[in-house]
UniProtKB/Swiss-Prot annotation:
Gene Ontology CC annotations of this record: extracellular region
Membrane-traversing stretches: none
Coiled-coil region list: none
Entry protein name: Tryptophyllin-1
Taxonomic classification: Eukaryota, Metazoa, Chordata, Craniata, Vertebrata
Annotated segments matching region Disordered: 24-61
InterPro entries registered for this protein in UniProt: Frog_antimicrobial_propeptide (IPR004275)
Length: 61
């Protein structure tokens, strides 16, 4: 019975450790994707501002 308790405890402990590692990786992936989305949005906003500031390539006379 003692061996069964130890093995069950070990299995639960290892399961919790693996879940915590997966959660950390998921958070890091989410952070990286959020950063790339923010950079993309900033780049898009900058290009939209540039489009507004530039006159059209042709000007009607």
């Amino acid at each position: 019975m003692d061996i069964l308790k130890k093995s069950l405890f070990l299995a639960l402990f290892l399961g919790l450790v693996s879940i915590s590692f997966c959660d950390e990786e998921k958070r890091q992936d989410d952070d990286e994707s959020n950063e790339s989305e923010e950079k993309k949005e900033i780049h898009e906003e900058g290009s939209q501002e540039e489009r507004r500031e530039k006159p059209p390539p042709w000007v009607p006379v």
